[in-house]
Amino acid sequence: MDYNQRHKNCIDQFKKEFEETAITVSGGANYAKVADRQRIFREHFPDAQVLTDLKSIDDTHVVFKTLIKVNDKIISSGWSRTVLKSKAKAIEFGETVSLGRCLANFGLTGDEYASIEEMIDVPNIKIEKPVVK
């Protein structure tokens, strides 16, 4: 199967499953978990390389860049910048956000571009609908 058909099938599966796995926050926007995006992506692109690179770290921030390659061609990228003091696991969180943005750039995104992982710490945001598995 060629790349374009695999991409279409991946997006179609994501949209179908998003109906069941989306997390709704106050205001009615629906978000996807990075783990759900990655699982679906891997089903359609098991041969892809996901390359996460810690670009910089200092006393206040950590910056990650994630690339996805298929057949040695970059098909998507994503960046994150995380405040170190805001999370106990800021490095892991930053890597996850970078991957989520990379998968969103690929087309695996819900009603909103951000993932639920990014939205959890936003002030005045309340999760209304839990994940259904």
Identify what each model region corresponds to.
Residues M1-K133:
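Polyanion-binding surfaces on beta-sheet-dominated domains and ring/shell assemblies
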